Swiss-Prot record:
One of its GO terms (molecular function) is metal ion binding. Homodimer. Heterotetramer of two MnmE and two MnmG subunits. Disulfide bonds: none annotated. Mg(2+) binds at S238, T259. Belongs to the TRAFAC class TrmE-Era-EngA-EngB-Septin-like GTPase superfamily. TrmE GTPase family. GO terms for cellular component: cytoplasm; cytosol. It comes from Helicobacter pylori (strain ATCC 700392 / 26695) (Campylobacter pylori). This is tRNA modification GTPase MnmE.
Length: 461
């Protein structure tokens, strides 16, 4: 796309424009314009001179006198906008070509094509949002976990900023008190003051650790729980995968060794992301390709969180079953022992199977041919292994930089607590903790750092 703007210097004073909606056809596309020239561009596009801020207008959109579309347009007057500048939105019909043509018209009238994250960067620099709120908005776009939506919404509302500001205010009071007492001799410092400061720090550290622990647990949850499906050939592993997906994803056949590699799919189970890994049947094989698949199956057990060990209930235990039992015992992972094909006459020696299993396990009899019933039973068994996270009234750190800053603040507060009787050192560590807290909401560093941070955001955001 050609930008005909005469300005070649990319500055925060430029008027920028971008398509804010995803690529592809849809009901509408949204073009955003931000900057001192935004309203003038909108006036030229619509051939309308008067716009009341925050009113929606349905109006024709023109480019060089040619009608492009009839669209919904809104003008947000500075500073009452997302970026803090004049912002105009054009909501046109959802043709990608049409949106591109309107965007090009904006560029022809003097706007510059926005860089990734530049709208958010303007909002940050104009003090419309702090870093925690901006990161929450990005994570809301990417979020795939229903349980974390509430925490992100609260962060977007500014509650993390309030929490950090309250903690910073508390530490500033402690710092002021210690600075006053530095000139006193140690014996003149009231013991109850030191006791009160120590208790204050313990509570502050505990609140920070709670935030950090919840954020780390949520990060692990976002990765998803890896669930490996293992068993001898033809035990019903692939049928089990298909039942959980409610579709034919893995090839099902009576021929042993049909699945020769791991197959991975992602599903949501009771609000949790689960990565299902269907593995090659575990048995002794002379086939080189199948052996590689079996080795990969065994490797997947090392990295999984839960194992589904599948046995054929309609057949007596044989060598391959005992090999599987040995594999489960050595893996030492949470295990659900699935007894498949319970629609057939049972021949598997269940008591012998139980006696050989040396790990905690949950037993489930099912029939993978009845997909819906199988999925319901499995969901109950699998979800019992998920850690219970209370997300109500919780705050969340969404970036590694925030977590490192909070970890450093905790370390400094612990150091301060250890140096309570040496007030110079105490003050030094309290001040360092405050500086780390500042990094959570407004990390004042260099323009290069800001460019790098916001470049991870999407266009139009």
């Amino acid at each position: 796309m050609k930008n005909t703007s005469s300005s070649t210097t990319l500055t925060m004073n430029d008027t920028i424009a971008a398509i804010a909606t995803p690529l592809g056809k849809g009901a509408i596309s949204i073009i955003k314009i931000s900057g001192h020239n935004a309203l003038n561009i909108l006036k030229q596009l619509t051939q309308k001179q008067d716009f009341t801020p925050r009113y929606a207008y349905v109006h024709d959109i023109f480019s060089n006198g040619v009608l492009l579309d009839k669209a919904l347009v809104i003008y947000f007057k500075a500073p009452y906008s997302f970026t803090g500048e004049d912002v105009c939105e054009i909501q046109c019909h959802g043709s990608p070509l049409l949106a591109q043509n309107i965007l090009q018209a904006c560029l022809n009238l003097g706007a510059r094509l926005a860089k990734a994250g530049e709208f958010s960067k303007k909002a940050f620099l104009n003090h419309k949002m702090d870093l925690s709120e901006i990161e929450a908005s990005v994570q809301l776009i990417l979020c795939e976990d229903e349980s974390v939506l509430n925490a992100l919404a609260r962060q977007l509302k500014g509650e993390l900023k309030i929490f950090i500001e309250e903690a910073r205010g508390n530490l500033l009071k402690l710092l002021a008190s210690s600075e006053v007492l530095i000139d006193y001799s140690e014996e003149d410092i009231p013991s109850d003051f030191l006791d009160g400061v120590s208790l204050n720090l313990e509570k502050q550290i505990a609140s920070f650790k709670d935030l950090l622990d919840f954020s780390n647990a949520q990060k692990q949850r976002n990765k998803g729980h890896a669930l490996s499906i293992v068993g001898k050939p033809n035990a019903g592993k692939s049928s089990l995968l298909n039942a959980m997906l409610l579709e034919e994803r893995a090839l099902v056949s009576d021929i042993k060794g049909t699945t020769r590699d791991t197959i991975e799919e992602v599903i949501e189970l009771k609000g949790h992301k689960v990565r299902l890994i269907d593995t090659a049947g575990i048995r002794e094989s002379a086939d080189k390709i199948e052996r590689l698949g079996i080795e990969k199956s065994l490797k997947s057990l090392e990295n999984c969180d839960i194992i589904l060990g599948v046995f054929d209930l309609s057949k007596p235990l044989e060598k391959e079953d005992f090999n599987l039992i040995d594999t489960l015992n050595r893996a030492k992972k949470p295990c659900i022992v699935v007894l498949n094909k319970n629609d057939l006459a049972p021949k598997l020696e269940l008591e012998i199977l139980k006696s050989y299993l040396k790990i905690p396990y949950t037993l489930l009899e099912t029939n993978t041919l009845n997909s819906k019933a199988c999925l319901k039973d499995l969901s109950q068994k699998i979800s019992a292994f998920f850690p219970k996270l209370d997300t109500q009234n919780k705050l969340l750190l969404t970036s590694l930089a925030q977590k490192i800053a909070l970890e450093n603040a905790i370390t400094e507060l612990q150091n301060a607590k250890n140096h309570l009787e040496t007030l110079e050192l105490f003050s030094y560590h309290i001040l360092s903790a405050i500086e780390n807290l500042n990094l959570l909401t407004r990390p004042y560093e260099t323009s290069q750092m800001l460019d790098s941070m916001f470049s991870e955001f999407c266009l139009g955001k």
